[in-house]
């Protein structure tokens, strides 16, 4: 390529990025005291290095500047005949070569439908092949994929699509009780008379294209037809586009899980997610392991699934096994056994469900070497059972947030059981973390508790077109406020103590629910425990434990209180104990504590 053409391409890319008004990745200022707390994390740190609650993870491996499509293309060239993914329930198997052919057809089809670089396409549905297909087709076409929660109802999906000005939506006709096309027709009755790609909606003025994966609907494209619509002109357009796409382009809008308030659109770039997948995969050892087959039950709509599954697949050539379209604990175990999975992903709740299967011992899990538990705090007792009952010895905890692409701390497979049980792992490469006093903002002494803050390549570009919310969580010098109470040790391992907003203040005493939850998990009859603060006229708040018992077990309030007495401080002993069958969850498996609190107070008549 001539220098003149290269300069023209760079100017075009720079001009495009400027129109989006995204903050640039900042240069980290040199701070002498912080430089002394840098630590190499390509391997588990063996020398106690940190002297304060600040750490900068160093690596001999540089940050990657590739786009998602460049990563996938390189892997396709290396392993064309290797299985890329298996959708067990739907009977779909694709090699990398077959998958990439579909990606190119779908990307050209999107251009044929009138979509262009920088447009937003909402993917609304469960874990189906078309979700992964759209993830990579949009990346190749320079279109921003919007991950829409498959459980959203009418008002929620309208809010999401309007928030990010979606130009297109891809969805199945329905899934279980979710009638996606019917809801879209309620929002856009104009679909009934519109031509495909020509929707003009009063409620969703930016939406002009609906693509249905499995049936022909009025005003919509059928995906398989769209994949044949690309002409030689569109393929040439696609080829020319590859010269203009850069790693700083936004690629993905992930809505925060909405455990409180309205969801916000965390906007991530190629640079964010490629590097997060690259260094997370390296931490687990995907760069040297052979024949890695990952059981992936977590939803694709969440970063854990799309980055930890899809982008890692594109980088390392791993095979991803999707056990079922919707979450099913037994389907996970069947898929592990049938497909000889070597790694398994899941939220703590998913592992609890698998551990709770009465015939768990009948499943052959001998192929599994390791896995990741992430998405919400993993109680120590649950981790012990994963290690000892399921026998997953190379299990690690991953910690992060959607806004951080998502992983910022992750364990090493060779870590001791104690580290796996007590911490969320070690700082990720090229990432800074500090623990500060939430009131003063000053870094706390090593080992002390405070709010965890993160800075580095992983921090999102912004909440989509929401400067106010972005400023609330990202400081002027690009530190992201996690809202988590944490502490660091000398080796750069992190312990999460709880959420600031979940803190219970009982008569002036600060109580972290996670501490009580971890203790309750040691009771032999308890499957899962969640603790919330409920209002109390005298104390301000009181502690309430909502407990799920193991199958076939019976227990009383008095038995639980007697178990607590003398083992935890008297003010931490729950005043109220409720035995429940389930908890309000987000689609990603996170407990919605605010809804649990509301439900509990109503049940108690408070």
UniProtKB/Swiss-Prot annotation:
It catalyses: a medium-chain fatty acid + ATP + CoA = a medium-chain fatty acyl-CoA + AMP + diphosphate; octanoate + ATP + CoA = octanoyl-CoA + AMP + diphosphate. SUPFAM superfamilies: Acetyl-CoA synthetase-like. ATP binds at residues 256-264, 484, 499, 590. GO terms for cellular component: mitochondrion. GO terms for molecular function: ATP binding; medium-chain fatty acid-CoA ligase activity. It is found in: Mitochondrion. Keywords: ATP-binding, Fatty acid metabolism, Ligase, Lipid metabolism, Mitochondrion, Nucleotide-binding, Transit peptide. Gene3D superfamilies: 3.30.300.30, N-terminal domain of ligase-like. Its EC number is 6.2.1.2. It holds the Pfam family AMP-binding. Its main location: mitochondrion. GO terms for biological process: fatty acid metabolic process. CDD domains: FACL_like_2. Acyl-CoA synthases catalyze the initial reaction in fatty acid metabolism, by forming a thioester with CoA. Has some preference toward medium-chain substrates. Plays a role in adipocyte differentiation. Belongs to the ATP-dependent AMP-binding enzyme family. This is Medium-chain acyl-CoA ligase ACSF2, mitochondrial. The gene is acsf2.
